[in-house]
Amino acid sequence: MKRTLYLLAVMAFTLTAQAQKADYNLIIGTYTTPGNSEGIYVYDFNTNTAAFKANTVEKSVNPSFLSVDPSKRFVYAVNEDGVKSTVSAFSFDAAVGKLSFLNKQAAEGQDPCYLISDEKNVIVANYTSGSIAVFGKDASGALTAAKQVIQHTGSSIDTARQKSAHVHMVRFSPDRKHVIVNDLGEDKIYLYAYNRDAGDSILVVKDSVKIKPGSGPRHIVFSPNGKFAYLIQEMQGDLTVFSYTDGLLKKIQETDIVAKDFKGEIGSADIQISADGKFLYASNRGTANDITVFAIQKDGQLIKKSQSSTLGKGPRAFVIDPSGKWLLVGHQYTNDVVIFKRNQITGAITDTGKRIALGAPVCFVFVPKK
């Protein structure tokens, strides 16, 4: 009898622990202008079932991109607002899903669209002004004044969109010794050496790579093993594969996310890799509004597997949940998040019928409940 009770207790404890591991905070950044959202939203999300529940909201102007620091205690947001653009810092209580505003700093550029953070710094990509700003952090997680501002000055062939530099992304290299910077306006990727304690010279340019003229480099991701990088180009649907070694990129494949018979408007947006490194996903806005699935080969190259409608308009951002079971797509123009079931064997996605109704959802971050 005692043994039976003991086994039941162990089973109950195990099931409770598994349930807790499946409970996450889903933090969503939005556009508030134009739009009908208020700022940053936190949802409870269960990775076993894809069940969700609205929890809290923190008011903020156009927090279109978010970064959670390594401790999971602080969240940083861009506030995309033209010449009035700022960067905001929040503390985060993961146990209850609550953000608390700490402070903000001028973005040192116009329309920040991406940022990354570590224990020491927050690095921001300012799109319209074509600059990079590096901010420090104090012990409370608040932002200090900018330590370094780097201005790009180039251009490219598209006279409507590439008259000047437009920094679209900053990303740490896998070893965090470099920062990769995509400049849509220059058709160029910059590779900066990163020394987080170097005062006003935290970023020092090491190399740059020219991309196909008129293609517009947007987002880049690394394979889980850090050996390959994948660049999505916004303006023509191109997708470029690189090998990566110690701050240097070498091109090994050119492909695209556009269907052969597609004749509409292209607006490549987001790119993600499954945690097992087997599949790559890329979204296209414009008149396509779809996601293309690629299988990743051992040599890093891609094979196109399938293409699916995202069931909305403007799939600016999407995310694969921590379990790998679900893929969530945010629609900027139809104001919802569509939840797909992801086949972890084939990579294919299918609609679950689940929807989060939310104005212009454009960034997603998962943080475990504590």
Summary of predicted features, one role per range:
Residues 43-50, 90-97, 135-144, 192-201, ...:
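Short loop/turn segments immediately following beta-strands, especially the blade-tip
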Residues 31-33, 80-82, 127-129, 137, ...:
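Short loop/turn segments immediately following the C-termini of beta-strands
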Residues 36, 60-70, 108-119, 153-176, ...:
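Beta-rich, blade/repeat-based domains predominating
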Residues 97-169:
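Asp-box/WD-like beta-propeller blade repeats and closely related beta-sheet repeat scaffolds
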Residues 53-119:
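Blade-loop segments of beta-propeller domains
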